[in-house]
Amino acid sequence: MAAYLLAVAILFCIQGWPLGTVQGQVMPFMEVYRHSVCQTRETLVSILEEHPDEVSHIFRPSCVTALRCGGCCTDESLKCTATGKRSVGREIMRVDPHKGTSKTEVMQFTEHTDCECRPRSASGVNSRKHKRNPEEGEPRAKFPFV
């Protein structure tokens, strides 16, 4: 992977900026690529989706930030998946609309610590791959490995 990134960086330097663009107005390829890869990233997580048993209360804020896996894999048969997790606390305000009371408290949320591209489940993309005729061979890799 490092060799590929180096080769792309060298190619980009040789070719220079695309005509008609000004540095700063267009995000360079390597930066776009670096931001798109499978990695942990700050994500907004709904408190009620994370704690569905708490529907009788109102929370402020209604969502919190947590690191979650996201991004693209080099093959559509792969999915960016969490390989490490931890529990983190976030201080929120719990409002009880029936009693008209509120209090701050710490709630626990799952945060991803490590991510990697792993095969998707048997449904979707992989199921198409399994139905291929053996004479067809494997599908050709898509960009950036064309």
Curated annotation (Swiss-Prot):
Q: In which tissues is it expressed?
A: Expressed by the venom gland.
Q: Which PROSITE patterns match?
A: PDGF_1, PDGF_2
Q: List the disulfide bonds.
A: 38-80, 69-115, 73-117
Q: List the SMART domains hit by this protein, alphabetically.
A: PDGF
Question: At which residues is Pyrrolidone carboxylic acid found?
Answer: 25
Could you give a GO molecular-function term held by this entry?
A: toxin activity
Origin superkingdom: Eukaryota
Q: Which GO terms describe its cellular component?
A: extracellular space; membrane
Give the span(s) annotated as Disordered.
Answer: 119-146
Q: Which InterPro entries match?
A: Cystine-knot_cytokine, PD_growth_factor_CS, PDGF/VEGF_dom, PDGF/VEGF_growth_factor
Q: Mostly located where? A: secreted
Output the GO biological process annotations, alphabetical, semicolon-separated: induction of positive chemotaxis; positive regulation of angiogenesis; positive regulation of endothelial cell proliferation; positive regulation of mast cell chemotaxis; response to hypoxia; sprouting angiogenesis; vascular endothelial growth factor receptor signaling pathway; vascular endothelial growth factor signaling pathway
Role this protein plays: Snake venom VEGFs may contribute to venom dispersion and prey subjugation by inducing vascular permeability and hypotension. This protein induces vascular permeability probably through VEGF (VEGFR) signaling. This protein also induces a drastic hypotensive effect after intravenous injection. The hypotension is mediated by nitric oxide (NO), which is produced by VEGF-activated endothelium NO synthase. Also induces angiogenesis in vitro.
- State the protein's name: Snake venom vascular endothelial growth factor toxin
Taxonomic source organism: Bothrops insularis (Golden lancehead)
